């Protein structure tokens, strides 16, 4: 099958996907530390290629991709997961879309290749952290009075 025929359709889908669902890219280690934000609940879904993680932060639901290091086929590793050090947080609405095996692979191919997207997402994540810090300061300020 010549996949180039579908490239425009796929570009359109990915544009929609990024606009609708991606909140920001968050480094897995930050999520692991649970530094500032309260993680109310974490649920894991294991799929053939990835672990999907439902994360609840301040009553908002996000979904993270966590690279499945154990079950990943070596052949796919370099091709699909090349620069992925991040897990991608998206709306939970997208769960059905993401649990489709092929869509996971295709979407993972697109995210890391766009450096611009990574930078934009990184800035959004920084902004998110600042907002959380400000919330904490306000909470602490109120409790002291």
Residue ranges and their predicted role:
Residues 7-106, 112:
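Conserved binding/recognition cores within well-folded domains
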Residues 1-34, 75, 117-145:
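Eukaryotic intrinsically disordered, low-complexity regulatory linkers and tails enriched in Ser/Thr/Pro
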């Amino acid at each position: 099958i010549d996949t180039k025929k579908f490239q425009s359709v796929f570009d359109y889908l990915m544009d929609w996907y990024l606009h609708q669902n991606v909140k920001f890219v968050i480094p897995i280690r930050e999520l692991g530390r649970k530094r500032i934000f309260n993680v109310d609940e974490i649920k894991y879904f294991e799929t053939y290629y990835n672990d999907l993680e439902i994360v609840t932060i301040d009553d908002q639901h996000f979904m993270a991709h966590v690279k499945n290091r154990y079950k990943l086929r070596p052949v796919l590793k370099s091709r699909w997961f090349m620069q992925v050090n991040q897990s991608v947080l998206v709306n939970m609405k997208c769960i059905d879309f993401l649990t489709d095996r092929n869509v996971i692979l295709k979407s993972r191919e697109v995210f890391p290749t766009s450096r611009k997207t990574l930078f934009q997402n990184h800035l959004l994540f920084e902004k998110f952290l600042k907002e959380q810090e400000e919330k904490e300061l306000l909470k602490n300020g109120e409790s002291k009075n």
